[in-house]
């Protein structure tokens, strides 16, 4: 099944301490957002990309599209106050389509095969998300004292892209907006409707670049891929 993609690139990434939008930080000689967009741009099943950005930075992104020959960005949407608002704006900008994949621009290492698996699962189940099993011991803490050790056997760390039938995720966002509900990810809005969300095995290398330390991991992942 073909799909449309929404890629989020409006956050300023203050924890990166880069003095600019982290999407413009170079990773292996290319801006972070370019590496992310190239995955979707090179996927024949991707019909088009809506890029959510700060409107003051549109010109910078357009220059990157020209320089790196990114062809599938069909529309811009403005970033909102919260991530959820940014996604909603992106959904409003979609041209059409049955399946939408919503992805963080700061995750450049997603594989095309995972895009296909998620899109196909969204057709079957309505909603599908990638996740990896939690490896570390998780503690619930109160006032910097351990209150409880959480059983990690059923815990998964969720990633993006998250895939949905367009009609379902639109309904989920509309209902959340009416109720003033702010979720931690898009799948949580679908869960709120009582609808099932399918988990697919993700990839530990599909990291989100948030802090300067993440750049070190990203360079190592990039080097390992070049060596493959």
Swiss-Prot record:
InterPro entries reported for this sequence: IspD (IPR001228), IspD/TarI (IPR034683), IspD/TarI_cytidylyltransf_bact (IPR050088), ISPD_synthase_CS (IPR018294), Nucleotide-diphossugar_trans (IPR029044)
GO MF annotation: an example: 2-C-methyl-D-erythritol 4-phosphate cytidylyltransferase activity
Matching HAMAP family: IspD
Function: Catalyzes the formation of 4-diphosphocytidyl-2-C-methyl-D-erythritol from CTP and 2-C-methyl-D-erythritol 4-phosphate (MEP).
Site (Positions MEP for the nucleophilic attack): 152, 208
Pathway: Isoprenoid biosynthesis; isopentenyl diphosphate biosynthesis via DXP pathway; isopentenyl diphosphate from 1-deoxy-D-xylulose 5-phosphate: step 2/6
Name assigned to this protein: 2-C-methyl-D-erythritol 4-phosphate cytidylyltransferase
Alphabetical UniProt keywords: Isoprene biosynthesis, Nucleotidyltransferase, Transferase
Site (Transition state stabilizer): 15, 22
EC nos: 2.7.7.60
Reaction it catalyzes: 2-C-methyl-D-erythritol 4-phosphate + CTP + H(+) = 4-CDP-2-C-methyl-D-erythritol + diphosphate
UniProt record, GO biological process: isopentenyl diphosphate biosynthetic process, methylerythritol 4-phosphate pathway
Similarity field: Belongs to the IspD/TarI cytidylyltransferase family. IspD subfamily.
């Amino acid at each position: 099944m073909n799909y449309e993609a929404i890629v989020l690139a409006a956050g300023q990434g203050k924890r990166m301490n880069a003095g600019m939008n982290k999407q413009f930080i170079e990773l292996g000689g290319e801006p972070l957002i370019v590496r992310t967009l190239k995955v979707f741009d090179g996927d024949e099943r991707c019909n088009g990309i809506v890029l959510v950005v700060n409107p003051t930075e549109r010109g910078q992104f357009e220059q990157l599209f020209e320089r790196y020959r990114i062809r599938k960005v069909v529309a811009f949407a403005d970033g909102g106050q919260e991530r959820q608002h940014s996604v909603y704006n992106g959904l409003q900008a979609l041209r059409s389509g049955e399946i939408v994949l919503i992805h963080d621009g700061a995750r450049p290492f997603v594989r095309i095969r995972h895009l296909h698996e998620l899109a196909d699962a969204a057709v079957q189940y309505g909603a599908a998300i990638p996740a990896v099993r939690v490896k570390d011991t998780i503690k619930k803490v109160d006032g910097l004292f351990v209150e409880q050790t959480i059983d990690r056997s059923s815990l998964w760390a969720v990633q993006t892209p998250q895939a949905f039938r367009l009609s379902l995720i639109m309904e989920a966002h509309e209902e959340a907006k009416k109720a003033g509900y702010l979720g931690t990810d898009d799948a949580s809005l679908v869960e709120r409707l009582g609808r099932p969300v399918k988990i697919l095995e993700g990839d530990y290398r599909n990291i989100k670049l948030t802090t300067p330390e993440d750049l070190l991991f990203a360079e190592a992942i990039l080097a390992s891929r070049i060596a493959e």
